Amino acid sequence: MEYVLATRDNFIEQIKKSDIIYIHGGETMNLINEIKKCADFALLVKGKVIAGESAGSYLLSSIFYSKTIGHLEEGLGILPIKVICHFAGLHVEKLDSIRGDLEKALLKDYQYKVYSL
């Protein structure tokens, strides 16, 4: 097994060659905006094991609420979920007000959910 840190210059080739992809937390909107530059990202990760933590989870979701951002935002929609990470019992009404067709994921710190597409 080889661990490779993604680079902007080789990102698409790195995704194509990878079986497992981990998307870290951090600056949510910067991460989403950078990944959106890769128009085929959803197709590139299809069939791969992909894990997202915090901002990475927001990126994969359809809708998310981040207390740092302070309002609802759209993820890439790779997972048909609406999510709050670092959930502490607040802001559920934000998710309840939109897209009743999506599963709601309220993830406390160190809590994870596994989905299969």
Predicted regions and their residues:
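Flexible gly/pro-rich beta->alpha loop and the following alpha-helix that scaffold active-site loops
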Residues: 2-49
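Active-site-adjacent pocket-lining segments in enzyme domains
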Residues: 32-36, 41-51, 56-117
